[in-house]
Amino acid sequence: FIIATITLYKQLQYMQNSNLGMNLNQLLVIQGPTVSSEGQAEKNFAFKNTLSQLAFVKKQCASNNVPGVGYNFSTEGITKMNNPQKGDDKKSYSMFICDQNFFDTYGINFAQGKTFEPNDAERSWNNVRKVIINEKAAQQFGFDLKQNIIGQKITWGEPFEIIGVVKDYHHLSFREQIKPTIYLGSVSFGYFTVQVDS
């Protein structure tokens, strides 16, 4: 019993002292409706607007999944537009759908570029064709992190412009390696996250 207690204590200390690459303090996650209905995007927008008006809410965002739970999906067939290498289309990327406030709410820092513009997220990723990637994805695409990646294009059936590169963070757990991730802007969501004032 004593050995198990000491081991658990050390694991908790490690987790508390380790850098996740994001800030989870004072965050509250609200799961939205699991069934999509007509006009759901408008309802989501109204709910987010109501959240932002509450005095105890410092920041808020919406996403189709949340850190610790998972990604939206994984896919292959995405390559750098200029000079793709043989086999690049077989590399897998995790896809995560979120709004423009996700990175600020979770304290995820940008290495380059910026988040989505509000009207870009409202028009949805498949119409705007702008993406944000993490450092791991940038490296897997073959980009040099010391060079400017903003404005570069990737191909996923159609060309998508990279508008931001976020620093890597532990999206799932410490045990799992950080996955190459592409972030897509949208306003169709299943989760709302608020940072509350303590």
Over which residues does each language-model region extend?
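Alpha-helical transmembrane segments
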Residues: 2-25
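Extracytoplasmic/periplasmic
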Residues: 12, 38-58
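Membrane-interface junction motifs in transport/secretion proteins
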Residues: 18-41
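Mid-to-C-terminal secondary-structure elements
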Residues: 49-198
